[in-house]
Amino acid sequence: MESQEPTESSQNGKQYIISEELISEGKWVKLEKTTYMDPTGKTRTWESVKRTTRKEQTADGVAVIPVLQRTLHYECIVLVKQFRPPMGGYCIEFPAGLIDDGETPEAAALRELEEETGYKGDIAECSPAVCMDPGLSNCTIHIVTVTINGDDAENARPKPKPGDGEFVEVISLPKNDLLQRLDALVAEEHLTVDARVYSYALALKHANAKPFEVPFLKF
């Protein structure tokens, strides 16, 4: 990004926003030129993408980690596969969506889960607002873990309720073999896995790899 020569040094080397200039705006996103002060007192600019739908002091949306639990079955993670025009292909993702006006993250998570997968669940936990791609956008989400009672009659034959223009395929993969199953889908179908999904699968693998073994480091 662009930079200018130092002006007055910023107080205590703290970086801060000076101004934001709108470059272009569409229905869902806008492009801005952000001018800020770096720790040395230089004025710099950054191209930033922001959602037009953001509400004050709330995250933009939610991503749902749906854990499907059934008697005598391994736990499964419910994912969605859909075509993403910016990627030019199909992606595997957690069910996700924007938070509506007056809606809590928990309510948005349950709504999006039912709309995209047909499943009804219960909230297990909700993260604080976390950033998505801070080098590009200010977009934030809550990551909400939801448990699904697969033995419940209402979840026996789930029927998604996609919105206009949404075409979603529901995929359930075993939690204890998630990373390997994702890798197999990538190899077979040449699709892309959302970074949140792949990071979750990696974390499961790392957590299950000799969890009680004390590492021995060589110096």
From Swiss-Prot:
Q: Per the record, what is the consequence of mutating T45A?
A: Impaired phosphorylation; generates ATP in the presence of diphosphate
Carrying Phosphothreonine, the residues are T45
Q: In the UniProt record, does the keyword Transferase occur? A: yes
Q: Where is this motif: Nudix box?
A: 97-118
Does the record's keyword annotation contain Oxidoreductase?
A: no
Q: What InterPro entries does the entry give?
A: Nudix_hydrolase, NUDIX_hydrolase-like_dom_sf, NUDIX_hydrolase_CS, NUDIX_hydrolase_dom
Phosphotyrosine is found on Y74
**Where does cross-link Glycyl lysine isopeptide (Lys-Gly) (interchain with G-Cter in SUMO2) occur?**
K42
Q: Where in the cell is it found?
A: Nucleus
Q: Name one GO biological process term.
A: ATP generation from poly-ADP-D-ribose
Keywords carried by this UniProt record: Acetylation, Hydrolase, Isopeptide bond, Magnesium, Metal-binding, Nucleus, Phosphoprotein, RNA-binding, Transferase, Ubl conjugation
The entry's Mg(2+) 2-binding residues are E112
The chain residues annotated with the modification N6-acetyllysine are: K210, K218
Q: How is it modified after translation?
A: Phosphorylation at Thr-45 is required for homodimer stability; dephosphorylation results in destabilization of the homodimer. Dephosphorylation at Thr-45 promotes the ATP-synthesis activity.
Subunit structure of this entry?
Answer: Homodimer. Interacts with PARG.
Write down what this protein is called. Answer: ADP-sugar pyrophosphatase
